[in-house]
Amino acid sequence: MKKLIILLFCGASMLLYSQNINGRFSSSLYSFERYDAVNSSEKYIRAYEMLNLNFNYENISVRSFFNLEGNLSNKMEYDPRLRFYHLYFEARNILDLATIKLGRQPIINSVAGGIFDGASVHFKKNDYKFSAYYGANVPAYQKLEIIDDWSDNYLLGGRFTTTVLKDFQFTVAYINKNFKPQPYQAIRLLPDLVTNPILVDIENKSNQFEFITGEVFYTNKNLISVFTSYDYDLNFNQTSKFAVDARIQPIERLGINAYFNYRQPKIRYNSIFAVFDYANTYEVELGADYQISSGITVIGKFANVEYKDDNAQRLGVGLATQWGTLNYRKTFGYAGELDAVSVYSGYTFLEGLLTPSIGVSYTNYKLSPDDSESNNLTTLLAGVNIRPIRLLSFDLQAQYMDNKIYKNDFRLFFKLNYWFNINI
């Protein structure tokens, strides 16, 4: 209650001094059936109320994003639950150089993205950008609290980017994320394997991820683009990932893509899985797309993945048009066998007022090439988007799935969106 009163007081204060208030409100209903046992199931209707609310005064903003969720039937133990995803203060263009954020805010990072409670600063000058952040992990279920034991649950990092060379972008980044797991007890044998087992307290350290990342991006108008990234794991002292993604357009309407990556499994340093023996993978993918006309494009891709003692392949071909898409996908080898066909169509009528959509897919798969029996999966979806005015939309979608595990699985989703932008 105290937190709610403080929030209402802060909200009233921000309302008085704001020049602009904008954001989006969404209300959703999700209906599904959950099986608790072989012949026992319950039907649920779950509601989500989301609000993205921003108060703005010149170059200063307070941004928030939170969600209230709960069941309308068969209530769960923790219902209702309020999640705070964003709640931070932002000051932009300080001395035409810096932007500062303070509070619960998002972080975009290939190693450990998400949200955190803390501070970040962003500098931009000509062809140079630099950002740094420091804070703590968010409590479970995004509660409006500061996590206990900040020293063992923090993350810090930075990112430097420059475009000083024509057609190039260079980036160097660092992240250090700590998260201390809850201690627990386990039964262990003594080294002699004879003495009676003993109960041992297990308490791991907090160091989870520590990475250095390098990126190089090159583009030459519409002819060629190449993106290269490299991740080095400082905890394990080894390369975690190296990837190259390239695209070239040798002639008009034809594009050729090539992708390569070397990848180690991303294991938390303080996880029990860190002591296991694991191997890396190599992946190569080649693809092409050809634009037959202004509204029709043919796409094809083939990839090979090399594991320690085996390999797997995947093949995909498709047709993309202004009315929808048609795709076929096949995988074979160590990763399992799969044949899948999918068709999707969506089109807008009456100047955006009505957008119906429909899709169907059929999949035949084996989890292992040695399996004698294959499984079938059929999926259907149908939906409609209604936008009577630019700021208001309604979405309704029905999903149906059927295989030997989920028989006649039917789900229904409804969503209302309202955007607002008020100048005071």
Q: Where are the regions that the model predicts?
A:
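Beta-barrel outer-membrane channel/assembly domains of diderm bacteria
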Residues: 18-94, 98, 411
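Repeated loop/turn-to-beta-strand initiation elements of outer-membrane beta-barrel proteins
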Residues: 21, 59-64, 95-101, 127-132, ...
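Transmembrane beta-strands of outer-membrane beta-barrel pores
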Residues: 29-33, 57-59, 68-72, 104-108, ...
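Outer-membrane beta-barrel domain signature
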Residues: 36-42, 72-78, 106-110, 143-149, ...
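Residues that define the transmembrane beta-barrel architecture of outer-membrane proteins
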Residues: 41-49, 80-85, 113-117, 152-156, ...
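Residues on the lipid-exposed face of transmembrane beta-strands in outer-membrane beta-barrel proteins
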Residues: 49-55, 87-91, 119-123, 158-162, ...
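Outer membrane beta-barrel
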Residues: 76-139
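Outer-membrane beta-barrel transmembrane domain signature
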Residues: 148-154, 169-202, 211, 332-393, ...
